[in-house]
Amino acid sequence: MVGLLVTMGFVNKQQDALLCTALNVSVNQDNDLYFLDKLDIIQMIKDRGDSIVGQPKSTVNVSEIEKSLNSHSNIANAEAYMSIDGEMKVEVTQRKPVVRVMNLDGDSYYIDSDGTFMPLSNKYTAKVLVASGMLSEPFIKRYTYSIADIGKDSLLNATSLLDEIYAMANYINADKFWSSQIQQIYINKDRDMEIVPMVGDQKIIFGDTTAMDEKFKKLLTFYQQGLNTTGWWDKYSIINLKFKNQIVCTKK
């Protein structure tokens, strides 16, 4: 037993003295996200003042490096660990924006798939839905919140439309047809959401997200009829989905 403990202690000392041989970084770029690449991650680690390669494994603070990376606004998750042969590995998953918000002051930011606010990037612009119109909330004030926080705060819930925008963006993005047909969500002066189609110049008034699935089904029926009727698209200037069990259209 004593011999075993001595051997284990010797092995542990050897491991502590082992030098870090390499820094291996991988960045998940699924969904064509290019906010960050491996060179960016390496630079973040260098900017912390951390020396990695050539240093004893025991002196490399892996947990602090991981914590620092996870605090970055474009990173959804980062995992850092040291292999038994002295290679430090860092695996990064980027945040996935679902909508870009543009407010009245020209301030702009993303909301990601988890409902977290994230800034724009000088390096990459995500091809996502745009939400604009009568929105005044600046990113600086919102960044400490998430969509979940809005639902918990009565004041935020009463004044913010971002949770409505987030819910609609998720619905559109999850549907192959609508994600190919809708390019923008617009908030009008009545605080109703309007959706801007890729094709056609109609104003489509959606209202809020109440009965959202039903409203999209009504709109789909309208689209299907329009596709099968010559001149249908040119008849109407406004399509209003706010009313239950009906579509109210205004002719041009």
Which stretches of residues belong to each language-model region?
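Charged, solvent-exposed interaction patches on well-folded alpha/beta domains
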Residues: 1-27, 48-56, 60-67, 71-252
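N-terminal export/assembly leaders
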Residues: 31-57
